[in-house]
């Protein structure tokens, strides 16, 4: 075999030992480029046709760029050689060996001494016609193409050759000259910490180059938003920088990058035109791969050519992301998906307590079917509107709510389901249906949820009502049970006639006060529902103030329903003050709304002729200053006998049907007024 041309020329005797076919091929390829005896090829700093002037003149292959494509030039150009003192002579002899088919590229390319395992070296580009031609963006032979093979053998390239030794190894680079010489190396070259790699494929791929239009004071251009994550979209191939974290969300075949010094961003696509940076337009290039999004990309100086290779191996697992359709018509458009808007579990919550005769207002749940333990559900579901905003300059794309399981502060699990178009579905109760239908024509209409009739879903009937939280952003919610009693007189009569002890009521009583049940109830291990409800009201502010706080959920997601023993005036005042975080503006709005409600109740024909038991006031406010109060839960609101009317302020005795609603409302307004004035 013939020795490597880097080690010198062969003697005539050694050359004669080669096969005739090799000699013929060697002579044919040498052509007119063979050097005269005694003459040496000029070095990188020398002038001449094969050398390069000191000032950085054009390279020898500039004239061929308009005649041959990249794939065609690979047969005429030398294979890369390692750095060393023989680099110049190797460039000539190695090309001859490769042309004769006698040299095969190594499967493991030699690592450049000036590279560490994670850096991609960049070379300065002189002020030459080549640079001007490349910056002009109109190449006669189109984009550069590289033939990636999985075996990494026989891969001649014009500029650089990057191979992947293995999945866990660093990428190496063989950077050599395009024709007969090596580019001058610099001692203090900035490294590209953000190493980018390509997966090798067995077909031609288009590899673009990114030109940095300007640099910073330390001669290094940097990509913007280096800490932003890049999110791939399945088939559209766009990268969206949400600027929220440092994670990389999976591979893609195209990358959107922002060029320094431009107001717009550069979205790279293989069929898009070039727009020069420094304008508000979009700069489009062609690229394959993606960035790891952890470190900025450093360039050594203006006008330098950088080939960015992206690694698919350092990516985190793919996460499902909605597909976006982005249109650069306006600086910050807001796109909304087609379909009805509603609520989601993490967004808003329900406003109901028990609302049927066989339900207890003490059956507390959270999360639309979760546990009744306050500790289990405290802070588990934040009360804020679900609004995912993905920002990528100059666009703002937001996604609003679709469907959500209803979240309750109190009441039985499964009472609510998500509706459509800003509505909710509450389990059907004929008493509540009749009350809501009458309230739609009563002066109380602005203080109750709108009613849209009965609907069927999955074989069950539901009352369809307005979602009262639709206009709030991250609301804080409080449920106050109004009145001096929360049970109907009919329930007492029924319990006497057909007592039905319940084990669950006994367990609830013992959980609050183990000494509350009588010895007989302890022995039986069960109590009736009216017995439990009467006992419960003696513990809370229902018996002392005419209302009690059922539950509170703050904007930060914390939930508290442990108000069973909140009875003293000072305790209730403290809870109310904490609910509004001492915001006097919110307090004044609540007071004004409650005063309007009281005036309307006193003039309402419906209210005068109905026993309102177990109903609640729903308090809602948010960070924007919006604050409202509504009457909810009419499952135990029943009509009075003919010609009977209630004052709603007198104490209750069995038979007078007084509920103490206005008595409790008067006390609540007085407490809030005191807080607002203090």
Swiss-Prot record:
Primary location: nucleus
Functional summary from the UniProt entry: Catalyzes the phosphorylation of 1D-myo-inositol 1,4,5-trisphosphate (InsP3) into 1D-myo-inositol 1,3,4,5-tetrakisphosphate and participates to the regulation of calcium homeostasis. Can phosphorylate inositol 2,4,5-triphosphate to inositol 2,4,5,6-tetraphosphate.
Residues bearing PTM Phosphothreonine: 330
GO terms of molecular function: ATP binding; calmodulin binding; inositol-1,4,5-trisphosphate 3-kinase activity
Gene Ontology, cellular component aspect: cytoplasm; nuclear speck; nucleus
Region (Calmodulin-binding): 504-512
Motif Nuclear export signal: chain residues: 318-326
Keywords: ATP-binding, Calmodulin-binding, Cytoplasm, Kinase, Nucleotide-binding, Nucleus, Phosphoprotein, Transferase
Span list, region Disordered: 26-128, 151-300, 328-380
Organism in which the protein naturally occurs: Mus musculus (Mouse)
Compartments (UniProt record): Nucleus; Cytoplasm
Name assigned to this protein: Inositol-trisphosphate 3-kinase C
Gene Ontology biological process terms in this record: cellular response to calcium ion; inositol phosphate biosynthetic process; phosphatidylinositol phosphate biosynthetic process
Record carries keyword Cytoplasm: yes
Reaction catalyzed: 1D-myo-inositol 1,4,5-trisphosphate + ATP = 1D-myo-inositol 1,3,4,5-tetrakisphosphate + ADP + H(+)
Enzyme class: transferase
Similarity section: Belongs to the inositol phosphokinase (IPK) family.
Activity modulation: Activated by calcium/calmodulin. Inhibited by high concentrations of the substrate Ins(1,2,4)P3, and allosterically activated by the product Ins(1,3,4,5)P4.
Binding site residues for substrate: 481, 502-508, 529-536, 636
Binding site for ATP: 426, 466-468, 479, 553, 633
Biased composition (Gly residues): 44-58
Comp. bias (Basic and acidic residues): 61-76, 107-116, 173-196, 220-236
SUPFAM superfamilies given in the database record: SAICAR synthase-like
